[in-house]
């Protein structure tokens, strides 16, 4: 097949304007190959700007690129290797190896742009995926085949919580895909080594587009990871775990690309196509009758603003929302999850059972009432409260402390062994705190324990 070539006629940042013969004009989203002194890279056609010119976003480096450079129209979108050959590997946005090993020898490659599953093919059955993390399993349980978001500002523990979820859920078996979107290089390398040490790397694919790379890379690497997960679901009929860290960086990269194209932004400087871009991405993360994709996504909150447009655009697509709060982290309680702001569609007696549901509702009531009483305590002190309110405050503080937990992935930093808490032990512990069994115990006794069995 003859490959059509074009010539770069202008370069503005990562935006390339390319001239082709009128009959050879590439389609929108098709990949164009170009070379610099650093290597061979791809660009993606985003706009037809004239009868024989296109605008493309570089998915790679542009240093050393000059006008007059020849580009090759590949005739299809970016395609990445999928299947067994990429299991246990660390890849970049093109699906090329970045783990120092030979390139994956894939028999099959899939384009990163795909249609979402048809409505008639979707699987609507619901099953709870237990994580062993108390606050998540109690307040915002995760649905198998659902989408879960971890929301929080900088430094409140999103990535650590994500790594603990990867550790706990991956140990149960199955295939996993971790996609690092615009995150730190050391986090990706650290995760890769932890997966290797724990013995689950052989069933995991790590895809990285780091924060030092171009906005085109950060915008498309999420689709690379998703495509690998879709192949496992559709062709190998497997249940897949898809971890994405961080969805905000995916949105931010789209905003940068939009600005480079000269498009007018909306509130907060985001791209006008924000809702559509997030929707197109999230709609592909679905469970079908063949297999499921269970997605856990970190979402950074700029300035801790839960109403930021990037967070709002993501909320409506999620089944479970886990909100991490700085004020809880400041108390030294980790994971710093706010049970009052976190919720899950799975917290329903039909899914979790009547006992679990009622205990979760009681916990939320006690913590909400404690929040209301906190203002009185701050001004007048505990002495002004009724005896019932004093008991409620002490129980609320015990519950708050009890929902802390030592993690396996942070053992080497804290010196405390991680704990996986079984559901029955969790519910029994909450029942005992709420019914006053431990009213004579200190609140500090409940910090970083597993269950009531660990009370001495």
Curated annotation (Swiss-Prot):
Alphabetical UniProt keywords: ATP synthesis, ATP-binding, Cell membrane, CF(1), Hydrogen ion transport, Ion transport, Membrane, Nucleotide-binding, Translocase, Transport
KW Transcription regulation (keyword) present: no
Chief location: membrane
InterPro entries linked to this entry: AAA+_ATPase, ATP-synt_VA_C, ATP_synth_F1_bsu, ATPase_a/bsu_AS, ATPase_alpha/beta_chains, ATPase_F1/V1/A1_a/bsu_N, ATPase_F1/V1/A1_a/bsu_N_sf, ATPase_F1/V1/A1_a/bsu_nucl-bd
Enzyme Commission no: 7.1.2.2
Topology within the bilayer: Peripheral membrane protein
Single GO MF descriptor: ATP hydrolysis activity
Residues binding ATP, per UniProt: 152-159
Cellular component, GO annotation: plasma membrane; proton-transporting ATP synthase complex
Compartment(s): Cell membrane
Pfam families linked to this entry: ATP-synt_ab (PF00006), ATP-synt_ab_N (PF02874), ATP-synt_VA_C (PF22919)
Family: Belongs to the ATPase alpha/beta chains family.
Known partners and oligomeric status: F-type ATPases have 2 components, CF(1) - the catalytic core - and CF(0) - the membrane proton channel. CF(1) has five subunits: alpha(3), beta(3), gamma(1), delta(1), epsilon(1). CF(0) has three main subunits: a(1), b(2) and c(9-12). The alpha and beta chains form an alternating ring which encloses part of the gamma chain. CF(1) is attached to CF(0) by a central stalk formed by the gamma and epsilon chains, while a peripheral stalk is formed by the delta and b chains.
Its job: Produces ATP from ADP in the presence of a proton gradient across the membrane. The catalytic sites are hosted primarily by the beta subunits.
Entry protein name: ATP synthase subunit beta 1
């Amino acid at each position: 097949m003859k490959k059509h070539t074009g010539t770069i006629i202008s370069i503005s940042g990562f935006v390339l304007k390319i001239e082709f013969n009128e009959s050879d004009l590439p389609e929108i989203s098709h990949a164009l190959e170009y070379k610099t002194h650093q290597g061979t890279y791809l660009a993606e056609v985003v706009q037809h700007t004239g009868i024989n010119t296109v605008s493309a976003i570089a998915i790679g480096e542009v240093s050393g690129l000059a006008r007059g450079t020849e580009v090759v129209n590949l005739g299809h979108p970016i395609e990445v290797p999928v299947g067994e050959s990429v299991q246990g590997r660390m890849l970049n946005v093109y699906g090329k190896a970045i783990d120092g090993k030979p390139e994956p020898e894939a028999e099959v490659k899939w384009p990163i742009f795909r249609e979402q599953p048809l409505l008639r093919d979707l699987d609507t059955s619901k099953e709870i995926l237990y994580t062993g993390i108390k606050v998540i399993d109690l307040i915002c349980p995760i649905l198998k085949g659902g989408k879960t978001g971890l929301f929080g500002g900088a430094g409140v523990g999103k990535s650590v919580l994500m790594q603990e979820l990867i550790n706990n859920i991956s140990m149960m078996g199955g295939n996993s895909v971790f996609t690092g979107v615009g995150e730190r290089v050391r986090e990706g390398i650290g995760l890769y080594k932890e997966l290797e040490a724990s013995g689950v790397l052989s069933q995991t694919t790590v895809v990285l587009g780091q924060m030092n790379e171009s906005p085109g890379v950060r915008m498309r690497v999420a689709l690379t990871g998703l495509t690998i997960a879709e192949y496992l679901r559709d062709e190998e009929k497997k249940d897949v775990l898809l971890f994405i860290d961080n969805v905000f960086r995916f949105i931010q990269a789209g905003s940068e690309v939009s600005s480079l194209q000269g498009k007018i932004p909306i509130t907060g400087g985001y791209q006008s196509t924000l809702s559509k871009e997030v929707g197109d991405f999230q709609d592909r993360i679905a469970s079908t009758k063949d297999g499921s994709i269970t997605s856990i996504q970190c979402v950074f909150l700029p300035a801790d603003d839960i109403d930021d447009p990037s967070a709002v655009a993501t909320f409506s697509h999620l089944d479970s929302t886990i909100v991490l709060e700085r004020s809880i982290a400041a108390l030294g309680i980790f994971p710093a999850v706010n049970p009052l702001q976190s919720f899950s569609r799975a917290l329903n007696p039909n899914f979790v059972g009547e006992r679990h549901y009622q205990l979760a509702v009681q916990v939320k009531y006690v913590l909400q009432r404690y929040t209301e009483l906190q203002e009185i305590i701050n001004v007048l002190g505990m002495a002004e409260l009724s005896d019932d309110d004093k008991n409620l405050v002490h129980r609320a503080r015990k519950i708050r402390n009890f929902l802390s937990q030592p993690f396996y992935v942070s053992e080497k930093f804290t010196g405390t062994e991680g704990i996986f808490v079984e559901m029955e032990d969790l519910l029994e512990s909450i029942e005992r705190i709420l019914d006053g069994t431990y009213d004579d115990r200190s609140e500090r006794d409940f910090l970083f324990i597993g269950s009531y069995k660990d009370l001495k």
